[in-house]
Amino acid sequence: MKTFNQFGQPVGEALSNWQPRQHPSRVVLQGRYCRLEPLRVEHANALFSAYSLAEDTRSWTWLLREPDATAEEFAEWVANVSELSDPIHFTVIDNQTRSPVGTLSLMRIDPKNGVVEVGHVHFSPLLSRTPMSTEAQYLLMRYVFDTLGYRRYEWKCNSLNEPSRKAALRLGFQFEGRFRQALVIKGHNRDTDWFSILDKEWSALALSLIHISEPTRHAQI
C-alpha cells in the first residue's frame, strides 16, 4: 500500500510493528518423503556416491565450484562448509532408504530485513524430478515463512540455466529481473536472474504444494 510523507511524496507501506527476525538455525525438517538435516561430514561419502550416479558432470556446470575428483576432496569441502552460519547447508535424506541424496542451503541471510535466499542446490539423480525434490524445497520455505516469519525468499540463477529458471517458476517464485554481468564464474560471464516469493504470497502457494507433504516438524540440533 502506498503512503505519503509530510511532503506529499509517496513512500513505502508503514511497518510500524516490524522487528528483526531470528537467524535460521541448524534444524531438522521432517516431511513425508524426505527430511532435511544440517550437512555433516558423516553425509559426505553417501552424497559423493549419489552424485557419482550421474552419467556426466553436467549438474556441476552452474555451480560455483568444480566437481570433486575423489570422495576425500568432497569430504574436505563438506568439513569446511558444514559449520558455517551463512550459508547454512542442508542434506536431503530419503525417508525410505535413509540415505543422503542431495543438498541445498539458506544463504545471504538478512534477519534485519527478513530476507533469505535458497541456493547451492545440488540434487543427485536419486532426488531430481521426484516428489522429494519438491518437498525438500517446500520444507525449507515453510521453515522460513511459518517458523522464522521472514518477508522475502529469494532464488537466483545463471540466466542461461534454463532448468533452474523453470524450477523456480514451477515452485511459485516470481521473476523480478536480470542483473547483467553480475559475476565471473569459472572464467565466464554470468548474468543473474532474480526470483522471489513474498510472505503475503506464501499461504496460497503452500496450499498448492501441501499435497506432497504431511505436516512437518523441526527440532534444533
Model-derived segments and their meaning:
Residues 93, 119-131:
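A short, internal acetyl-CoA/4′-phosphopantetheine-binding micro-motif in the GNAT/acyltransferase core
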